Amino acid sequence: MEEDTNISNKVIRYNTVNNIWETLPNFWTGTINPGVVSHKDDIYVVCDIKDEKNVKTCIFRYNTNTYNGWELVTTTESRLSALHTILYNNTIMMLHCYESYMLQDTFNVYTREWNHMCHQHSNSYIMYNILPIY
């Protein structure tokens, strides 16, 4: 798995109070397929980082009230890169595709627990950069 050099290691957000774009500090370089979701005052970046052995899925958090920079919240070993990242009810969901199976990992932002929930066989075509709806 190679790093996409066209993806910036910066996250920008639009400040609706001051009507300006803000660039948040850099987080780790070498990230693969970053997905960004926001939850209350926090911005989460879910990305894959490749090391010598395999790929790790990492979740970084940036609090927009404290501006203390990025915090590495958690990592987990992964053999698959996340296709899509979704936030729903305090849970960050990562969808993966392997052959004809859709795999779903969840991470609760309050309990900080991972749950590898579902291995669902899919008869439909799953494409990159398009959110599958079942």
UniProtKB/Swiss-Prot annotation:
InterPro entries in the record: Kelch-typ_b-propeller
Gene3D superfamilies for this protein: Kelch-type beta propeller
Misc. remarks from the entry: Corresponds to the C-terminal part of cowpoxvirus Kelch repeat and BTB domain-containing protein 2.
Sequence similarity: Belongs to the orthopoxviruses B21 protein family.
Protein name, as recorded: Uncharacterized protein B21
